[in-house]
């Protein structure tokens, strides 16, 4: 089953699900993508796949009708980060991210780089604390706050810099929605349907729990990509979210 469209702008989905692609071979990635419907999810392309296959992979996904979250977590000096974010916007991605720990000047430069794109600009999201990190990991870096406290501090800085939202764990979502308002988007990895293995994500939730917590976009990987019937798995997840709503 293959779904095609002329560009990512043709994708129409109200689903909050973003499927994380994690493939070492381009053909296998596209074979998986051709089994699912762009009306049921968006797709996330990370560092490994983008390094292996480059911008053409993003174009291939867009041609199939999918919105793409380019998950490269830019973290560099302000000018370099701004140019990278603008390049992502030129590529037509739906969402791009930076590390909030890059600081206010870097995030503001990234935001300003998207101004020429107006309504066609991608969502600009900042990463707070990686979901694989616990308190001991932060202590190793000299951060004495808990992951939740550090994430909230970085999220507040992100909002002050005018970005669209943050990547955060689902456990932070309720507090973040209260602190930063409904318009501030929350993107959450580590989302796994009930019965899935935790993998390398320490702070996880089910899709239904994440929706109740206030998550706007939930990233789901192997429970979908390794499913024997990924299209049905997506439909089941979306149906459960509609019931929860």
Swiss-Prot record:
Pathway: Pyrimidine metabolism; UMP biosynthesis via de novo pathway; UMP from orotate: step 2/2. Substrate binds at residues 22, 44, 71-80, 131, 192, 201, 221-222. The keyword 4Fe-4S does not apply. Its EC number is 4.1.1.23. One of its GO terms (biological process) is 'de novo' pyrimidine nucleobase biosynthetic process. It comes from the Bacteria. Keywords: Decarboxylase, Lyase, Pyrimidine biosynthesis. Catalyzes the decarboxylation of orotidine 5'-monophosphate (OMP) to uridine 5'-monophosphate (UMP). NCBIfam families: PRK00230.1, pyrF. Belongs to the OMP decarboxylase family. Type 1 subfamily. This is Orotidine 5'-phosphate decarboxylase. It comes from Salmonella typhi. The gene is pyrF.
């Amino acid at each position: 089953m293959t779904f095609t469209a002329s560009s990512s702008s043709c994708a129409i989905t109200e689903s909050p699900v973003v499927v994380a692609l994690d493939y070492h071979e381009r053909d296998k990635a596209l074979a998986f993508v051709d089994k699912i419907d762009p009306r049921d999810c968006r797709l996330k392309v990370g560092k490994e796949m983008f390094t292996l296959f480059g911008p053409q992979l993003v174009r291939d996904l867009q041609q199939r009708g999918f919105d793409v979250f380019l998950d490269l977590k830019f973290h560099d000096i302000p000018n370099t980060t701004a140019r990278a974010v603008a390049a992502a916007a030129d590529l037509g991605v739906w969402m791009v991210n930076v590390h909030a720990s890059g600081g206010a000047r870097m995030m503001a430069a990234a935001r300003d780089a998207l101004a020429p794109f107006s309504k066609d600009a991608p969502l600009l999201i900042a990463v707070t604390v990686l979901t694989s990190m616990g308190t001991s990991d932060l202590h190793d870096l000299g951060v004495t706050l808990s992951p939740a406290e550090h994430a909230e501090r970085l999220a507040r800085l992100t909002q002050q810099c005018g970005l669209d939202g943050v990547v955060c764990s689902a456990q932070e979502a309720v507090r973040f929605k209260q602190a930063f308002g409904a318009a501030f988007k929350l993107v959450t990895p580590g989302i796994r349907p009930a019965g899935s293995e935790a993998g390398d994500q320490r702070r996880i939730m089910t899709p239904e729990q994440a929706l109740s917590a206030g998550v706007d976009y939930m990233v789901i990987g192997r429970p979908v990509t390794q499913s024997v019937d990924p299209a049905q798995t997506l439909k089941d997840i979306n149906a459960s979210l509609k019931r929860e709503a």
